[in-house]
């Protein structure tokens, strides 16, 4: 086992804070409508230009082990916020840096870190409740477009595309983002279905950049039991291999020898296959397999109806134009099923909804209707160059997550104003002792920080703008894009409540952990000794005699 360096107290915290500052300073330049770009080096190909906080954070790895620990903890804030809310990563990083910076001053002054943490938690709890009160539901397509535009760094066209896509497939519908072929963004609605099961083995992945399996015009084998013996599958696999097309297996489970053989065939390029578990459980699983069968024009191979795997033919398999399988989701696009059969199935499920007694059953049945009838909207991102395409695509994906979050939990005024207004709930808050009060003060100060950073990135004087916004009431704030003050909701500067809430909670959680850290253990740098000098060549003596 390698030797470790053990560092205690202020020395450990100071190094970790340095790491936090390096990462946060790199990320926070991207905040707001006038945020700057960050250029990321790639080991091959051109560099990537981005204004996405989490993309910047993910690239940062520091040489100093202790600094790197601090940076990685804040990176966790950004990626957790991105996973939960899909946006707000830069805001979360700015909040975390502020809480750590202010908190360290109090820790250095001898206050109890655990009480500071309790004060911080108390203040964040009150602020989150206040944010929920400030929140209002998104009702119009215009509001959805505004949320999308703000999240895409004030690009109104992206917001409009997303609002249009949500109109087409409904708020519960599936929307994906692809590379376009032209300079303009395009929207295409494709019949399709998504379910929450991912690939059974990462070895099926054939698009490493997106970490997904993409199958073009595949066959779909639907089986309601476990597959563990490859012999059962061989007849079907041989027929599919002859047809020269990929195969997706959807079964209760594919395990052991069967899964291993599929993986080996895939890696060797003999037969392009993928396997996923069937969605749902019990009777619902059977019903959902039947839905997929109708959508793809196949048959569920079940012993109840006298079908076995060994006797399955290509006629029993479903087909689709394209299937995309991620770690947690599978999307079937353009199934080859008969339109009238799909319509009949939807009517049948709607009749079941009418008769359903429990809310849970009703909700699950409605989900099935949406999957069969809703389709998938594809936003094709247009750009002049590949570098611009990647950057724009990342912004569209961010905006899509933000609009989903807005539909889910509502919206609050953007531009850092919601956090300023939520301070009202904390202003009168008191802890059980002075140290907890200091924790509350830390959060009060941190909640100004996103607005300060937006203003700084816009090249204005932060303290003047913050003071003026604090004087105002309600939605009154500063629109950094136009440099005007006014009602931000009317101006269309909106943030999803979920994004703001998640950013604050995650930032406080990780920052509190750092304040209460008193020891850091890291691997000692290896001392590499210089290589020995090579020996001289033999037989070189007696050169003088040759002169």
Swiss-Prot record:
Gene Ontology CC: one annotated term: cytoplasm
Enzyme Commission number, as recorded: 5.6.1.7
GO biological process, one term: protein refolding
Binding positions for ATP per the UniProt entry: 30-33, 51, 87-91, 415, 479-481, 495
Compartment(s) of residence: Cytoplasm
Keywords tagged on the record: ATP-binding, Chaperone, Cytoplasm, Isomerase, Nucleotide-binding
PROSITE patterns recorded: CHAPERONINS_CPN60 (PS00296)
Domain of life: Bacteria
GO molecular function: ATP binding; ATP-dependent protein folding chaperone; isomerase activity; unfolded protein binding
InterPro entries per UniProt: Chaperonin_Cpn60_CS (IPR018370), Cpn60/GroEL (IPR001844), Cpn60/GroEL/TCP-1 (IPR002423), GroEL-like_apical_dom_sf (IPR027409), GROEL-like_equatorial_sf (IPR027413), TCP-1-like_intermed_sf (IPR027410)
Catalytic function, reaction form: ATP + H2O + a folded polypeptide = ADP + phosphate + an unfolded polypeptide
Main location: cytoplasm
EC top class, as a word: isomerase
Keyword ATP-binding: yes
Subunit record text: Forms a cylinder of 14 subunits composed of two heptameric rings stacked back-to-back. Interacts with the co-chaperonin GroES.
HAMAP family per the UniProt record, alphabetical: CH60
NCBIfam families: GroEL, PRK00013.1, PRK12849.1, PRK12850.1, PRK12851.1
The protein's role, per its UniProt record: Together with its co-chaperonin GroES, plays an essential role in assisting protein folding. The GroEL-GroES system forms a nano-cage that allows encapsulation of the non-native substrate proteins and provides a physical environment optimized to promote and accelerate protein folding.
Family stated for the protein in its record: Belongs to the chaperonin (HSP60) family.
Protein name as annotated: Chaperonin GroEL
Organism annotation: Cupriavidus metallidurans (strain ATCC 43123 / DSM 2839 / NBRC 102507 / CH34) (Ralstonia metallidurans)
Organism lineage string: Bacteria, Pseudomonadati, Pseudomonadota, Betaproteobacteria, Burkholderiales
């Amino acid at each position: 086992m390698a030797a470790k360096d053990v560092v205690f107290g202020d020395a450990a915290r100071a190094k970790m804070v340095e790491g936090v500052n390096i990462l946060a300073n790199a990320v926070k330049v991207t905040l707001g409508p006038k945020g700057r770009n960050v250029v990321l080096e790639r080991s091959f190909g051109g560099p990537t230009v981005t204004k996405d906080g989490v993309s910047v954070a993910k690239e940062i790895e520091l040489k100093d082990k202790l600094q790197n620990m601090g940076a990685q903890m804040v990176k966790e804030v950004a990626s957790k916020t991105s996973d939960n809310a899909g946006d707000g990563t830069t805001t979360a990083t700015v909040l975390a840096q502020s809480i750590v910076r202010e908190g360290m001053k109090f820790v250095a002054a001898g206050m109890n870190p655990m009480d500071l943490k309790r004060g911080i938690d108390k203040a964040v709890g009150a602020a989150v409740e206040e944010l929920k009160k400030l929140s209002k539901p998104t009702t119009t397509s215009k509001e959805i477009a505004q949320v999308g535009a703000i999240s895409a760094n004030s690009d109104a066209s992206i917001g409009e595309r997303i609002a249009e896509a949500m109109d087409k497939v409904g708020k519960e519908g599936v929307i994906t983002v692809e590379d376009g072929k032209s300079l303009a963004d395009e929207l295409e609605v494709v019949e399709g279905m998504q379910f929450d099961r991912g690939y059974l083995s990462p070895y099926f992945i054939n698009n490493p950049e997106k970490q997904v399996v993409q199958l073009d015009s595949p066959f779909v084998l639907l089986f309601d039991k476990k597959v563990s013996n490859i012999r059962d599958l061989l007849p079907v696999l041989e027929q599919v291999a002859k047809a020269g097309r990929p195969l997706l297996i959807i079964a209760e489970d594919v395990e052991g020898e069967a899964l291993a053989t599929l993986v080996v065939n895939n890696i060797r390029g003999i037969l392009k296959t993928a396997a996923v578990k069937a969605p749902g459980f019990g009777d619902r699983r059977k019903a959902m397999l039947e839905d997929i069968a109708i959508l793809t024009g196949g048959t569920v191979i079940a012993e109840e109806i006298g079908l076995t795997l060994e006797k399955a033919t290509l006629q029993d398999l479903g087909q689709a134009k394209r299937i995309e399988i991620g770690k947690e989701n599978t999307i079937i696009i353009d199934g080859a099923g008969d339109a009238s059969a799909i319509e009949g199935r939807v009517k049948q499920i709607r009749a079941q909804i009418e008769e359903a007694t429990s809310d849970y059953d009703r909700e699950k049945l409605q989900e099935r209707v949406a999957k069969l009838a809703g389709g998938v909207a594809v936003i094709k991102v247009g750009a002049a160059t590949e570098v611009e395409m990647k950057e724009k695509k990342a912004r569209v994906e961010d905006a899509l997550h933000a609009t989903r979050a807005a539909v889910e939990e509502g919206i609050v005024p953007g531009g850092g104003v919601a956090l300023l207004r939520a301070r009202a709930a904390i202003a009168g808050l008191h802890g059980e002792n002075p140290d907890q009060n200091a924790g509350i003060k830390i959060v009060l100060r941190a909640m100004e920080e996103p607005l300060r950073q937006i203003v700084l990135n816009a090249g204005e004087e932060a303290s003047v703008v913050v003071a003026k916004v604090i004087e105002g009431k309600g939605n009154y704030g500063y629109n950094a894009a136009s440099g005007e003050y006014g009602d931000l909701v009317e101006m269309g500067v909106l943030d999803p409540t979920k994004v703001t809430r998640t950013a604050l909670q995650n930032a406080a959680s990780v920052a509190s952990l750092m304040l209460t850290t008193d020891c850091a253990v890291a691997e000692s740098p290896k001392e590499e000794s210089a290589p020995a000098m090579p020996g001289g060549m033999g037989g070189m003596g007696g050169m003088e005699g040759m002169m």
